[in-house]
Amino acid sequence: MALKSYNPTSPGQRGLILVDKSALWKGKPVKALTEGKRKTGGRNNKGHVTSRGIAGGHKQKYRFIDFKRRKWDVPATVERLEYDPNRTAFIALVKYEDGELAYILAPQRLAVGDTIVAGKKTDVKPGNAMELAQMPVGTIVHNIEMKPGKGGQIARSAGTYAQVVGRDRGLVIVRLGSGEQRYIRGECMGTVGAVSNPDNQNTNLGKAGRNRWLGKRPLTRGVAKNPVDHPHGGGEGRTSGGRHPVTPWGKPTKGARTRHNKSTDKMIIRSRHAKKKR
């Protein structure tokens, strides 16, 4: 879908660039596939802030998305493409031959009226889901499981995809968007194609209020705070912090490695940081 730019009739309109959603469904979602969603304001059950920068935002309904695609060998027709406020990608309402309705992540080049199917092995066509072991090398794939039956976890946001680059001892080698290459079990499911709405990254919200509509609060820089509030705080006049970037709790940030999982280290063939090393 194309991008829309607006005439500068106000400061908020100047520079505003949004994705054109005219081809999406304009009605309400399927009631049986939605549920209410309560705002947390970034607080836990004790009322303590556990995730900063969250507050307000437009009221949303949660859409149940089928990330597992375990209804095998039953063709489904794409009824419509819809907007989903809970994610950057668009979603597709599909109707199976037995009458069941479901929402799936809409891949690029999926249109209303198309027929899709999930199974152990299917045609390599956008929207079809199958086991990674059955996909030809070079296939573009999204919504990839990391454990069989758990549901897709990799490449789910707008415009993302991974690529099958090889096979080895019952495992499939997949290159992720970050540049990482890793083994994934061949029984894990994946969906052919790249996720819809690739122009999401080229949007410009135009004004701070649009971010507030999304439920995002302003972020205060550490160097603008007092020493009691942040390790970068204080100092006479404007200072640059004087130390490597850290979180308010003193942990290194901005590029510091945080991954600690020895049990799955053996599944990573090439780290996403490999290209950065000199």
From Swiss-Prot:
Name assigned to this protein: Large ribosomal subunit protein uL2
One BP annotation, GO: cytoplasmic translation
Span list, region Disordered: 33-53, 219-278
Purpose: One of the primary rRNA binding proteins. Required for association of the 30S and 50S subunits to form the 70S ribosome, for tRNA binding and peptide bond formation. It has been suggested to have peptidyltransferase activity; this is somewhat controversial. Makes several contacts with the 16S rRNA in the 70S ribosome.
Compositionally biased intervals (Basic residues): 269-278
Gene3D superfamilies xref list: 2.30.30.30, Nucleic acid-binding proteins, Ribosomal protein L2, domain 3
Record organism: Sphingopyxis alaskensis (strain DSM 13593 / LMG 18877 / RB2256) (Sphingomonas alaskensis)
InterPro entries in the cross-refs: NA-bd_OB-fold, Rib_uL2_dom2, Ribosomal_uL2, Ribosomal_uL2_bac/org-type, Ribosomal_uL2_C, Ribosomal_uL2_CS, Ribosomal_uL2_dom3, Ribosomal_uL2_RNA-bd_dom
Keyword Membrane: no
